[in-house]
Curated annotation (Swiss-Prot):
Pfam family, one: SmpB
SUPFAM superfamilies, sorted: Small protein B (SmpB)
Organism: Methylobacillus flagellatus (strain ATCC 51484 / DSM 6875 / VKM B-1610 / KT)
Gene Ontology CC: one annotated term: cytosol
Keywords: Cytoplasm, RNA-binding
GO biological process: trans-translation
Similarity remark: Belongs to the SmpB family.
HAMAP family: SmpB
Protein name in UniProt: SsrA-binding protein
Function: Required for rescue of stalled ribosomes mediated by trans-translation. Binds to transfer-messenger RNA (tmRNA), required for stable association of tmRNA with ribosomes. tmRNA and SmpB together mimic tRNA shape, replacing the anticodon stem-loop with SmpB. tmRNA is encoded by the ssrA gene; the 2 termini fold to resemble tRNA(Ala) and it encodes a 'tag peptide', a short internal open reading frame. During trans-translation Ala-aminoacylated tmRNA acts like a tRNA, entering the A-site of stalled ribosomes, displacing the stalled mRNA.
Gene Ontology MF annotations: RNA binding
Length: 154
C-alpha cells in the first residue's frame, strides 16, 4: 500500500533500476507518516561515507507530538540497504549522469519502506516526447471507448 509517491521523478528522469530500502525514523515520524503527512516531491538521495541518506523529505509533525521532542520536519534520514546493493549503487552513481531519487513510500509487512530509483535525467525534448505519448494514449483510449459504444449501439 503506497503512502506517498514522487510523480515528478517519473517526469524528470528515466528510471533504470528500482531498490526497496528501509528508513530510520523517530516515533513521531512514524505516527505522522501513518496519517499521510509526508511529501517526497522535493526529496533526493545522496551517498556519503558508504551510507545512503534521504534529504528533503518533508514529514509534517502531528499537533499532538510530544513536548519534550523537537520535531524537525526536513531532517536527513538514513536509508537501509545491504552493503552489496550500496556498493553497486555507488559504482553506478559515480558514472556521469546517474542519480538516486525516491519514487515511493509504502508499507511492507507493517514496516515503512522507500523505493529508490537509479535514474538518468531527461532532456527537455524527452519530457515533451513523453507528454505527447501520454496524451496520445489517453486519446486512443477515449476513441476506443467511443468506437465500442457505437458498435454496441448498432
Amino acid at each position: 500500500m503506497s503512502i506517498a509517491q514522487n510523480k515528478k521523478a517519473f517526469h524528470d528522469y528515466f528510471i533504470e533500476e528500482k531498490y526497496e530500502a528501509g528508513i530510520v525514523l523517530e516515533g513521531w515520524e512514524v505516527k505522522a507518516i501513518r496519517e499521510n503527512r509526508v511529501q517526497l516531491k522535493e526529496a533526493y538521495v545522496i551517498i556519503q561515507r558508504g551510507e545512503i541518506y534521504l534529504i528533503g523529505c518533508h514529514v509534517t509533525p502531528l499537533g499532538s507530538a510530544s513536548t519534550h521532542v523537537r520535531p524537525d520536519a526536513i531532517r536527513t534520514r538514513k536509508l537501509l540497504l545491504h552493503s552489496e546493493q550500496i556498493a553497486k549503487l555507488i559504482g553506478k552513481v559515480e558514472r556521469a549522469g546517474y542519480t538516486l531519487v525516491p519514487l515511493d513510500m509504502h508499507y511492507t509487512r507493517g514496516r515503512i519502506k522507500v523505493q529508490i530509483g537509479l535514474a538518468k535525467g531527461k532532456k527537455q525534448y524527452d519530457k515533451r516526447h513523453s507528454e505527447k505519448e501520454k496524451d496520445w494514449k489517453r486519446e486512443q483510449s477515449s476513441l476506443m471507448k467511443k468506437y465500442v459504444k457505437t458498435q454496441a449501439g448498432s
